Amino acid sequence: MIQQNINTIVGSLPQHVRLVAVSKYHPIEKIREAYAAGQRLFGESRANELREKAMLMPSDTEWHFIGHLQKNKVKTVVPIVSMIHSIDSLALMMEIERQTAKFVDERVVRGLSPRIKVLLQLHVAKEETKFGFTIGELRGMLDGGLWREFKHVEMAGLMCMATHTDDREEIRREFQFAKTCFDEIRQEYFSVDGNFRECSWGMTDDYPIALDCGSTMVRVGSGIFGQREY
């Protein structure tokens, strides 16, 4: 079933869009089944769970951290992941810069770049519980310019999560707003930086809409693995 799900989803994605298999809360056996089906990129949202699973998977498995990241967990995450999707403050980015500098050798041994890629999380949903910058906050942070001094953090694009709703047009409006913000931010701050190119939005229930709105990376969990096991 997992192999069939992956084949169906991958077959529906444009060639330039990557599938992040959201493996959080799922047992290692299911992750291995997805790996056997050809999936190599997995997303986790808990630092300790990520570390435990990474130790049990082949070395060519790629890991992204996709959940809210507390600063005290950064040192656990940065030796393992190629990308962090959930940057919601300058302070978090500064801690990632500091910790990644300490783990450069370990990252290289794992086949990772000395620089860790990050996505800036944009708050587009109606729920106040979701994290992320408003577009005003994001511009303020970028205008400050401190991020330009980072040597171990590479800004790779934006991430967002839509409102949890059955209103498909609301979801489309939110994703389209995120794409507009991405285009403006890239033009204003990253016009000479070809690395700022990722749009991470779309999950199991809404990724087809996300694809219409410029997504380059979809995060699918239950659509691959079934319901979570807590």
Regions of interest found by a model, annotated:
Residues V220-Y230:
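Short C-terminal tail/terminal secondary-structure segment
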Residues M1-D205, L211-C213, F225-Q227:
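Conserved alpha/beta-domain cores
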